[in-house]
Amino acid sequence: METFQCLTLFLLFISTVFILKRKFSHKPNLPPSPPKLPILGNFHQLGTLVHRAVTVLAAKYGPLMLLHFGKTPVLIVSSQETAKEIMKTHDLALANRPLTTAARALLYDCTDISFAPYGEYWREMKKMAVLNLLSIKKIQSFRSVREELASDMIKEITRLSKTGAPVDVTNMLYHFSEDLLFRCTLGFKPKGQHKFQKLSRDFLDLVGAFCFNDFFPGMAWMDALTGLNRKLKKGSRELDDFVDELIEERIAMVKDGVEPNEFLDLLLHTHRDTTQEIKLTRDNVKAIILDTFLGGIDLPASVMEWAMAELMRNPSKMKIAQEEVRKVVGNKNKVDEDDVYQMNFLKSAVKETLRLHPPAPLLFARESYTSINVENYIIPPYTSVMINIWHIQRDPKLWDKAEEFIPERFMNSGIDYKSHDYEFIPFGSGRRGCPGMSFGVAAVEFAVANLLYWFDWKFVGDTTPETLDMTEDYCFALFKKKPLHFIPISRSS
C-alpha cells in the first residue's frame, strides 16, 4: 500500500512538471512553413525546377518561409527587403556554405573558394584569385585574349555559314568561354581540354543530385544502393586526373622556358613556398583551379546563350542591339573592347538577360552558424538559407511588365550589378557574392557583340520567335534545356 502511494505521488509529480513545462516553455517563433510529411519534410513539394516550386509556395506562405528537407531546415527568402536584411545585416552570420557530401568528394574536402568554410584560408584564397585573375586590372589585361578567341569563333561560324546549315550556337559559345578561362588561368589550352565539357556537366549533376547522407544521415547506406557513391568516386577520380594532367603540362612548359606568370603558376609557387603562412597542398591547388573552371566556364556560357535566345525571341530588341553595335564599330575589321563600353543597349540587354535568367536562381546556399533574428522570426543555427532572386527579379511590385524582355528598363536607370536596393542581384552580395562577376560580364558582352556585328541570324525550319523553346534545365545552376541552333548570314556575304 505504501509503495502504491509513493508511486502515485511520483507520477503526479512527473505529470505536474510535464504540464508546467508545456505551459511555460517558450517555443522559438519560426517562419511560416507548408505542411510537411513525416521524415521527408517538404521534399515532395519541390519538383525538378526548384526555383519555380518555392516561388509558388512563397505566394501562399510568405516571403520568409521555412522548409524542411529531411533533417535540414531550409529558409527561402523571396522578397527584396528580406534579402537585403539577410545579406547586409546578417552577412557574417551567414558566411558559411552547407558542406554537402558531393562538394566534399569533388572539391577536395571543400578547399576551393566557392564552398570553403569562412575563415583565414577562404579569405586568403579569395584575395589571391581576385588580385591575380578577377580584378578589373587583370580583366583588362586579358583583352587581347578575348579579342583573339572571339575572332577564332567568328571565323569558324563564317566557315560554317557558307553551307547555309544551322550552327550550334550553344556549343560555339561554350567553347569560347572554355578557351577564354583556360587561357586566362593557365596561359594555354590543355591537351585534354575536350574532356572538360562532359566533366563539368557531370559535376553539376552530382552536386545537384539527391544525397541521403545530407538529409537523412541514418540512411546514408542508401547512397551506395542508388549508385551515388560510385558516381562520386568516379567523378572525383576523373576530375582529379584532368587537373593533374594540366598541372604537369604547365610544369613541363615552365621547365622549357615559358614565363611562369599565370594564375596556376602563382598557386604552384605558393604550394612550394614553405615560408607562406597559409600552406597550400597540391590538392588545395587543384581545388581552386577546378573551382575557377567550373564557375567561370559554364555559367557565362549559359548567360550568352540566354541572351541570344531572348534577342531572337524579340526581333525589335535584336534590331536595336544590332544597329547600335554596327554603328559603334563602323567599318572596322573587328570589334574591340573600347567599342563595347559605348554599347549601352547591349549592356542593358545583358542585364535584362541576367534579370530573367540568373545562372543561380536561388543563389548558392548559405548556412547560419548561430541563431539570427529576421523580421522577428528566429532562424536556428545550421539552417540553409536560399535567396530566391529568380522571383525577386521578376516581382511585379518591383518591375513593370516583369515577365517581358525589356532592356530599356536598365537604360539610364542607375541599377548596376551591385544594387544597393537588392532588386537586382544576379551575382549575390556580401562576403559570398560572386568574385568573378566582372570577368564573366566582360566575356558575355564581348561575345554577344561579336555575334550581332558579324552576322544576321535566322530561325531553323518553321521555328518562330513565339515557338522558340525556352524550357529551363536546373541542375545546381540554371541552363537552357535545348541547345540553340540558328542559321548565320555573314555580313561579308
UniProtKB/Swiss-Prot annotation:
In the UniProt record, does the keyword Transmembrane occur? yes
Ordered alphabetically, the record's keywords are: Heme, Iron, Membrane, Metal-binding, Monooxygenase, Oxidoreductase, Transmembrane, Transmembrane helix
- Membership in a protein family: Belongs to the cytochrome P450 family.
Which GO molecular function annotations are given, in alphabetical order? heme binding; iron ion binding; monooxygenase activity; oxidoreductase activity, acting on paired donors, with incorporation or reduction of molecular oxygen
Task: Look up the EC number in the record and give it.
Answer: 1.14.14.131
Primary residence: membrane
Q: Cite the binding residues for heme.
A: C434
Protein name (database record): Desmethylyatein synthase
- One GO biological process term: phenylpropanoid biosynthetic process
GO CC entries: membrane
Please name the InterPro entries in this protein's record: Cyt_P450 (IPR001128), Cyt_P450_CS (IPR017972), Cyt_P450_E_grp-I (IPR002401), Cyt_P450_sf (IPR036396)
Give all cystine bridges in this chain.
none
According to UniProt, this protein's pathway is: Aromatic compound metabolism; phenylpropanoid biosynthesis
Q: Which cofactor does it need?
A: heme
Task: Determine the domain of life of the protein's source.
Answer: Eukaryota
Gene of this entry: CYP71CU1
Q: Which reaction does it catalyse?
A: (-)-bursehernin + reduced [NADPH--hemoprotein reductase] + O2 = (-)-5'-demethylyatein + oxidized [NADPH--hemoprotein reductase] + H2O + H(+)
| Signal sequence interval, chain numbering | none
**What membrane topology does this protein have?**
Single-pass membrane protein
Transmembrane portions of the chain: 1-21
User: Cross-referenced CDD domains, in alphabetical order?
Assistant: CYP71-like (cd11072)
One Pfam family of this protein, by short name? p450
This molecule's function is given as:
Cytochrome P450 involved in the biosynthesis of etoposide, a chemotherapeutic compound of the topoisomerase inhibitor family. Catalyzes the conversion of bursehernin to demethylyatein.
